[in-house]
């Protein structure tokens, strides 16, 4: 199992590098990430959240775990919806985030094969949330400055726990 990196850890702000090796190490890392995600009752977990600055994440929106490697969002539906999101890197913080209802995506699986699919609703939301992590974008970047100010004390408390 991995330790979850929390707000204040610099790895969360880096743009992750593409995965180039589809080997046993990657598969083992993904298995550990899935175990970690389930342990913390998450529905998604991006590599930067466990200190790995590479472009992949795992998610499970009810159909079993999926590994998403080198993802791209090909199309974003202009229709959006607002819903509450939490994040394992922001313990006990939940915020309303506006995201596209439907997206078309392309990514690689653990064998390096390309997968293209359309996601909507909850699956689209989780994909967009984890995709943000690969670009160093966090949920607090998607809320208003006023809401961020209201969370300032909680955020500072979380940042104080970061192991330097």
Curated annotation (Swiss-Prot):
Coiled-coil intervals, chain numbering: none
Sorted UniProt keywords: Hydrolase, Iron, Metal-binding, Protein biosynthesis
This protein's record includes keyword Heme: no
Principal EC category: hydrolase
Record-level GO BP terms: co-translational protein modification; translation
Keyword match Metal-binding: yes
Cofactor: Fe(2+)
Cofactor remark: Binds 1 Fe(2+) ion.
Disulfide bonds: none
Taxonomic superkingdom: Bacteria
GO molecular function terms listed in the Swiss-Prot or TrEMBL record: metal ion binding; peptide deformylase activity
Catalytic activity, reaction form: N-terminal N-formyl-L-methionyl-[peptide] + H2O = N-terminal L-methionyl-[peptide] + formate
EC number: 3.5.1.88
Sequence positions that bind Fe cation: 87, 129, 133
Active site per the UniProt annotation: 130
Family statement: Belongs to the polypeptide deformylase family.
NCBIfam families on file: pept_deformyl, PRK00150.1-3
Function statement: Removes the formyl group from the N-terminal Met of newly synthesized proteins. Requires at least a dipeptide for an efficient rate of reaction. N-terminal L-methionine is a prerequisite for activity but the enzyme has broad specificity at other positions.
Name this protein carries in UniProt: Peptide deformylase
């Amino acid at each position: 199992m991995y330790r979850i990196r929390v707000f204040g850890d610099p790895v969360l702000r880096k743009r992750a590098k593409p995965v180039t090796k589809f080997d046993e190490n990657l598969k083992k890392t993904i298995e550990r990430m899935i175990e970690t995600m389930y342990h913390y009752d998450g529905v998604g977990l991006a590599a930067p959240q466990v200190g790995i600055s590479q472009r992949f994440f795992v998610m499970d929106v009810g159909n079993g775990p999926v590994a998403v490697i080198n993802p791209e969002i090909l199309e974003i539906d202009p229709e959006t919806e607002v819903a509450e999101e939490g994040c394992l890197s922001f313990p006990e913080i939940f915020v309303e985030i506006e995201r596209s209802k439907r997206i078309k995506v392309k990514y690689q699986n653990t064998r390096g094969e390309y997968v293209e699919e359309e996601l909507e609703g909850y699956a689209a939301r989780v994909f967009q949330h984890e995709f943000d992590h690969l670009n160093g974008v966090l949920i607090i970047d998607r809320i208003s400055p006023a809401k961020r100010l209201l969370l300032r004390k909680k955020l500072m408390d979380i940042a104080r726990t970061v192991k330097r």
